[in-house]
Structure formats: C-alpha cells, structure tokens
Amino acid sequence: MWTLKSSLVLLLCLTCSYAFMFSSLRQKTSEPQGKVQYGEHFRIRQNLPEHTQGWLGSKWLWLLFVVVPFVILQCQRDSEKNKEQSPPGLRGGQLHSPLKKKRNASPNKDCAFNTLMELEVELMKFVSKVRNLKRAMATGSGSNLRLRKSEMPADPYHVTICEIWGEESSS
C-alpha cells in the first residue's frame, strides 16, 4: 500500500515540477498589457495590476501541495516501521508465531487474511466434491448412468476449469 502512495506522490511531484519549470516558457499574449481588442480598435482596461496571478498560478501553493502529503506519508511510514519493531525486552519467546504477530498489527489485514483462509477452505471443499463426482462417474459405482467412451474422464483426480463450469473442451 505504501508503494501505491509513494508512486502517487512521485507522480504529483513530477507534474508540479513540470508545471513549475515550464510555466515561465509559456507564450506571452501578443496584445499590449491592459489593452483588449474591441472591434477595429483597442479598449483599455482600467486598474489592471502588473502581475495578475490566481491561486492556480502560485508556485508556492503547488509546492505546498506536494510537500505536505509527502511529509504525511513519510511520518506514517516511520510510525508503521516503529510499530513493527518492538523493543527486545518486550519480545516474546519462541512460543509466539511470527504470523500471529503480523496479524495483530492491522485489523484490515486480519480481516483480509481470515477471508482468504475461508475462501481457500471453501475452494478445497468444492474441488474435493468435483473430484468425488468425477471419480464416481469414471468408475460407474453407485449409479445406473453409463457414459460413452468420449465422455469418460481421462484422470478422475485432475479437474479442469471447463469441467467445473460445465463447458465442453474444444479439442
């Protein structure tokens, strides 16, 4: 996750530095300062300041937009590193597994880990059921259904995605 944040900050820095460096190279307007073409003659604008700059044109504001998120990300990364490293006096013995230490670090990671474990268990149960059905079809035990030679599975333990989804193979 921190690599994603760092890459976003890097892209933001590159974009802002590009805008900062090349903003002075933009073409200046060809009309004189304070004059606007109005028909065939020029109309003079009143009270036009020398340098009109909006908040988007402020280089310091863009620099602030880049530096503040970068500092925040660095502080978060340092705090995460400090959480992972515990002092030697507080470390447990060899009884605690390193997996359990990592799981206690973040509740989001813990939830994702538990979800993945449940999905893995469900997938193993499903594949086991498919293998049992395939083996039963191959041996013909317990069923009156007789399969043709072309429908007989070559390996009752090998399960393909096409067989799970019920699609016929093109070969």
Swiss-Prot record:
Any GO BP annotation: cell differentiation
Signal peptide start and end residues: 1-19
Locations listed in the record: Nucleus inner membrane
Recorded GO CC terms: extracellular exosome; nuclear inner membrane; nucleus
Cytoplasmic side: 74-171
Disordered: region residues: 81-107
Record membrane topology: Single-pass type I membrane protein
Stretches in topological domain Extracellular: 20-52
InterPro entries (UniProt xref): FAM209
Disulfide pattern: none
UniProt keyword annotations, A-Z: Coiled coil, Differentiation, Membrane, Nucleus, Signal, Spermatogenesis, Transmembrane, Transmembrane helix
Coiled coil: 114-139
Quaternary organization: Interacts with DPY19L2. Interacts with CYLC1; the interaction may be relevant for proper acrosome attachment to the nuclear envelope.
Function: May play a role in sperm acrosome biogenesis.
Protein name: Protein FAM209A
UniProt organism field: Homo sapiens (Human)
